[in-house]
Amino acid sequence: MRLNTLSPADGSKHAPKRVGRGIGSGLGKTGGRGHKGQKSRSGGGVRRGFEGGQMPLYRRLPKFGFTSRKAMVTAEVRLSDFAAVEGDIIDLNALKAANIVGTQIEFAKVILSGEINRAVTVRGLRVTKGAHAAIEAAGGKIEE
């Protein structure tokens, strides 16, 4: 077997449609577009969501909600993520250094997910009740 002898399996590739190459091809003259109308023209067609002039669904329905700016700079941290952090004191900078949260994050909340098996001091992070109990059960403490 050589590179110049490789070819795709029979039937796995289709030849492209050759449009506008005579009556006998079945795709001559109008090229499968029919006669006249917007869709027969070059660049013809309607935009996504267009309903022929009827008020489209995306404009009939009301707008609602918003994107919280605070949510963009807040992260949830699992207890199991603490294993990747070196040192006994865990704060926002330690989480950023361990690549657990991004550099834009300003607030983090520790949630009860996974296990913690070493005593750590959590400083300056929000902590859920369940995570609070798990950290203290492992011999750690939480500082505000």
Curated annotation (Swiss-Prot):
Coiled-coil ranges per UniProt: none
MF term (GO), any: rRNA binding
Gene Ontology CC entries for this record: cytosolic large ribosomal subunit
Gene Ontology biological-process annotations: translation
Alphabetical list of InterPro entries matching this protein: Ribosomal_uL15, Ribosomal_uL15/eL18, Ribosomal_uL15/eL18_sf, Ribosomal_uL15_bac-type, Ribosomal_uL15_CS
Keyword field: Ribonucleoprotein, Ribosomal protein, RNA-binding, rRNA-binding
Pfam families: Ribosomal_L27A
Disordered: annotated span: 1-53
PROSITE patterns, A to Z: RIBOSOMAL_L15 (PS00475)
Keyword Disulfide bond found: no
Highest taxon, organism lineage: Bacteria
Gly residues composition bias: residue spans: 21-31
Role noted for this protein: Binds to the 23S rRNA.
Subunit structure: Part of the 50S ribosomal subunit.
Family: Belongs to the universal ribosomal protein uL15 family.
Name of the protein in question: Large ribosomal subunit protein uL15
Organism: Photorhabdus laumondii subsp. laumondii (strain DSM 15139 / CIP 105565 / TT01)
Gene assigned in the entry: rplO
